[in-house]
Amino acid sequence: MKLRPMQDRIIVKRVEEETKTAGGIFIPETAKEKPMEGEVVAVGNGKRTEDGKVLPLDVKVGDKVLFGKYSGTEIKVEGQDFLIMREDDILGVIEK
């Protein structure tokens, strides 16, 4: 199944968090916090202005992004977890 977000929404896949600390201690699932970092896997066409123009999004597929702890709506597609959020929920893009 292919999922295409509408307007200024994007689909993000969270990055996998380390299960072991630098000191070698394993972190159980119940103690982990969900990461606030992910990779953009799909983007909408853009945000529509009041006069009907479409402004393209700044983020693109493949960008690594940071977002707020409670941003987006969690969805599951074919067994994989994703977040759908608006571009405004993105706090920044991680550049290498």
From Swiss-Prot:
Its main location: cytoplasm. SUPFAM superfamilies: GroES-like (SSF50129). CDD domains: cpn10. InterPro entries: Chaperonin_GroES, Chaperonin_GroES_sf, GroES-like_sf. GO terms for biological process: chaperone cofactor-dependent protein refolding. It is found in: Cytoplasm. GO terms for cellular component: cytoplasm. Keywords: Chaperone, Cytoplasm. GO terms for molecular function: ATP binding; metal ion binding; protein folding chaperone; protein-folding chaperone binding; unfolded protein binding. PANTHER family: 10 KDA HEAT SHOCK PROTEIN, CO-CHAPERONIN GROES. Belongs to the GroES chaperonin family. Heptamer of 7 subunits arranged in a ring. Interacts with the chaperonin GroEL. Together with the chaperonin GroEL, plays an essential role in assisting protein folding. The GroEL-GroES system forms a nano-cage that allows encapsulation of the non-native substrate proteins and provides a physical environment optimized to promote and accelerate protein folding. GroES binds to the apical surface of the GroEL ring, thereby capping the opening of the GroEL channel. This is Co-chaperonin GroES. The lineage of its organism: Bacteria, Pseudomonadati, Thermodesulfobacteriota, Desulfuromonadia, Geobacterales. The gene is groES.
